[in-house]
């Protein structure tokens, strides 16, 4: 009996080793044994502040997000319309909450409005910007892949309940490797690119709306 177990040991080890290795994987073909948390951030160099705000106040409302953004898990996709999540890597905060706050900080730093608040905060604003995250994931169809972010922004005039403008912003940033740390870094870069396009668009739309005939 002992001889049989001795013979089985190498075979069992050969079977179990790949399984145990897969259990600690947080990358596509990469092994990192510890749980890691990543901060989604705006990597832009602060832009010069406007001499004067375009409007007195602006409110931001986060709309329901795509499933890839309504979870703390970091999503990746190797095939179209099919997603998975890194097992031992996550965001410090769900993107559906984090992204609007980051945009608020960018708009405040730029001085687009005298006050920028989230819906529900004590800020009275005639202008409302809604923000929907259409996707936020590591596109790994061709390794090492790229971070892909898509946001849809809509600007409303609350005084007459009309939509002023609507636009989707999409950006990608190459990942340095096919793993969670590189995916998190690339997604922050892609989000920064989206903000770089969204903020000038918003300024222009607000400027035109302010001077438009009532």
Predicted regions and their residues:
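Envelope-exposed proteins and targeting segments
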Residues: 54-56, 70-72, 79, 87, ...
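C-terminal motif of bacterial Sec signal peptides marking the signal peptidase cleavage site
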Residues: 19-22
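A structural "domain/chain start" motif
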Residues: 24-96, 205-214
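Bacterial N-terminal signal peptides that target proteins for export
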Residues: 1-15
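Sec-exported extracytoplasmic/periplasmic mature domains
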Residues: 104-112, 199-207
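Buried hydrophobic packing residues in well-ordered domains
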Residues: 60, 103, 131, 151-153, ...
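Short secondary-structure boundary motifs at beta->alpha junctions and helix caps
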Residues: 81-90, 159-200
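Surface-exposed short loop/turn segments
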Residues: 24-48, 110-160
């Amino acid at each position: 009996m002992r001889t049989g177990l001795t013979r089985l040991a190498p075979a069992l080890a050969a079977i179990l080793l790949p399984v145990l290795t897969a259990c600690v994987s947080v990358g596509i073909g990469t092994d990192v044994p510890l749980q890691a948390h990543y901060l989604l951030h705006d990597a832009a160099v602060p832009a010069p502040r406007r001499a004067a705000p375009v409007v007195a106040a602006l409110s931001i409302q986060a709309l329901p997000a795509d499933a890839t953004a309504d979870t703390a898990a970091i999503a990746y996709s190797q095939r179209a319309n099919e997603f998975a999540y890194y097992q031992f890597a996550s965001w410090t905060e769900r993107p559906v909450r984090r992204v609007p706050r980051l945009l608020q900080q960018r708009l405040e730093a730029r001085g687009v409005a005298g006050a920028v608040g989230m819906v529900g905060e004590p800020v009275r604003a005639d202008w409302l910007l809604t923000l929907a995250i259409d996707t936020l994931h590591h596109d790994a169809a061709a390794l090492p892949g790229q971070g892909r972010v898509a946001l849809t922004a809509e600007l409303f005039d609350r005084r007459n309940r009309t939509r002023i403008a609507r636009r989707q912003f999409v950006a990608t940033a190459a990942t340095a490797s096919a793993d969670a740390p590189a995916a998190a870094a690339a997604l922050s870069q892609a989000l920064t690119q989206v903000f770089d396009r969204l903020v000038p668009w918003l300024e222009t739309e607000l400027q035109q709306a302010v001077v438009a005939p009532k």
